[in-house]
């Protein structure tokens, strides 16, 4: 069995993520990270200083959102890593190399698309003025429409940051399932549908735990607003 646990990188999900992992006692826990980003999460400065400009923009944006939830972006990945260690399970870093991915993105993205991305300043692009809570609820109901809009406005960004990474992570899970009967993957909720489609098409047994299932508690601070988030980790 492969279990896909869909998370949000700016929410406090540590306890719930660990609960789902402990419940399944997997032999391997997969993380939506590459080695460099995993070690950056373990370091005090989070390793953003040398990251590409667009990555730093998006990461800083997520930092500001996460402050309202009392967490640091990526805490759910560290929680999953800690749970794996408690279970003596293997840890698999299944995402593509972030540095190479963003280098490709900058190389292949047309100037007009770059201009739209930078000019938007990320926030307020699709749904200006909506609270984080309102936007998350809409995304949870219909990721397909969200990614369709992204694909029209930023086709290169969607292809490289979403579609190609979904394929890469799904292939990694297929290989791991060949040697592990019980696999848990912790990744951004926006990746779940795409990876689920690939895995089910290959006839693999898959179950999902979605972000809306994990978010049983609401944050004390609810004043942050945003219009656009792109899963980058």
Enumerate the language-model features and the residues they cover:
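Compositional signal for N-terminal targeting/processing segments
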Residues: 1-233
């Amino acid at each position: 069995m492969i279990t896909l646990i869909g998370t949000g990188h700016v929410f406090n999900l540590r306890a719930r993520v660990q609960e789902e992992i402990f419940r399944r006692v997997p032999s391997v826990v997969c993380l939506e990270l590459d080695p460099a980003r995993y070690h950056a999460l373990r370091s005090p400065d989070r390793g953003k200083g040398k990251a590409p400009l667009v990555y730093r923009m998006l990461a800083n944006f997520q930092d500001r959102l996460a402050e309202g939830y009392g967490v640091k972006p990526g805490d759910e990945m560290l929680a999953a890593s800690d749970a794996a260690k408690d279970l003596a399970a293997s840890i698999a870093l299944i995402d593509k190399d972030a540095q190479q991915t963003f280098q490709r993105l900058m190389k292949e993205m047309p100037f007009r698309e770059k201009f739209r991305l930078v000019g938007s300043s990320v926030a307020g692009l699709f749904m200006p003025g909506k609270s984080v809570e309102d936007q998350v609820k809409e995304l949870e109901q219909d990721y397909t429409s969200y990614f369709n809009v992204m694909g029209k406005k930023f086709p290169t960004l969607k292809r490289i940051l979403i579609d190609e990474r979904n394929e890469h992570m799904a292939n990694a899970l297929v290989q791991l399932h060949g040697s592990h009967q019980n696999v848990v993957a912790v990744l951004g909720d926006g990746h779940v549908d795409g990876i689920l489609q690939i895995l089910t098409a290959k006839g693999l047994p898959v179950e999902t735990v979605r972000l809306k299932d994990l978010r049983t508690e609401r944050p004390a601070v609810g004043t942050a607003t945003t219009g656009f988030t792109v899963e980058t980790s």
